[in-house]
Amino acid sequence: MHKFFIRSFVSSLVLLFTFTVAAIAKDVKAAFVYIGPTGDHGWTYQHDVGRKAVEAAGFKTTYVEGVPESADAERVLRQLANSGHDVIFTTSFGYMNPTNKVAKEFPNVKFEH
């Protein structure tokens, strides 16, 4: 009886978690900003592998590749924030200052550096 209860409880939690994640995924729009091309088989490639896994889980994702660590980064971040993205991942060390600057302008958008 005890094992049955535990199995039922765990199964219920798994189902609840699965449907909760699916419901959240439909509402979250994530963007990734890359320093290089996605086909570089290096830093950017690995980030894009992660992005594709997030997308496979049901989240809406977009990405911009080849963004220099300059004023262009700020411009791209503002465009992504203005286009309805809920979370923006900046994947290069040189994006730190542009990310911090733009994040102050968009308090309802999550920025991950």
Segments the model singles out, each with a brief description of its role:
Residues 23-25:
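Boundary at the C-terminal end of the N-terminal hydrophobic targeting segment
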Residues 8-20:
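Bacterial N-terminal signal peptides
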Residues 85-92, 110-113:
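Periplasmic-binding protein-like
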Residues 27-29, 108:
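Residues that mark the start of a beta-strand
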Residues 1-6:
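N-terminal secretory signal peptides that target proteins for export/translocation
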Residues 31-56, 62-72, 92-95:
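Extracytoplasmic "Venus flytrap"
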Residues 70-84:
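Short, well-structured alpha-helical segments in soluble
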Residues 100-113:
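Extracytoplasmic ligand/sensor domains, especially the bilobed periplasmic-binding protein
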